Amino acid sequence: MFYGHHHSYSEKPDADKEAIDDLTRQAKDQTGVMATLTRARVEQLKAEIQAERAFSKGLDRSQKQILKTINAALEISSPSALLNLSPPEFSSLLLNGGLGEAIDGYIDQQNRIMKSIDKVMNATAPEFSMNSIEAQSAAIQTQNVSAIFDDLIVPEISAAVKAGLTDIMLFVPVEVAMSNMATKMKSSRGGQLNAIKTKISQYGRSLTAVAAEAADLDNYLFTGPRDGITRKFCRALVDLVVDEKQMSKLDNGQGLSVKTSCGGYNCRHSWSPVSEGFIRAANLQKAKPKNIAKANAGAR
């Protein structure tokens, strides 16, 4: 989703709670369509945070299962034979050995996020249905799974397993090699989960962007926490509406798309597609050139 706090995964989870509490307070102070939208955003943020935490637990279980799988494989095969497996065969070993379960669990979390986005769209465009972008949603879901597992998780786990198998082949005791394997997997977790947190947020934002295009909405309300730990880029935009032309001029300074990454890595703010009717009903303010310039000046 598109929220704008910017903490690393290793920081205390209170940062997520602060973002939820901030938005919840906003919803209580609001009325009508704006309150409905903010409540929907709270649900989406909760769904994304739940996805992050469930992913962490699922990956932990999968890595432990992979270690058991490799241990069992070594009882009937040699480390050199396992190292000689083709890339597809080696990936299959990891998937069937525990990683597949983590993928299935993440897809379940993706579906929860999609349902929360449906509520967001219902708040701003009641006539729109996510069913109308089923094909695009499936493509985004597949791409997101690939970006997380194929690009981040599988290479790290493969490297750790192959390093351990090489150690065993060089006569390092199996117990020592397996322990080193587990340590290597664990050491990569921090960076992985931080990147994954951003990928999960980008998934929700990408779905919303496609939904907005399908619903012919080209105005976006920037919503999210208003507290003091919010990026200057985000603080300059909170509660303002930008159009597509203004969106293209925004630069978060991190080389990431503003539409799908907002303020950048780990951002907890969001873009909500809104119609002209919604803008009038909620008495929203449209961003001016000075607001865009101020946001860009605060980017980092």
Question: Where are the regions a protein language model picked out?
Answer:
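Acidic, glycine-rich two-metal-ion catalytic cores of nucleic acid-processing enzymes
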Residues: 185-287
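N-terminal leader/targeting and assembly helices and adjacent pre-domain segments
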Residues: 1-193, 199, 203, 274-300
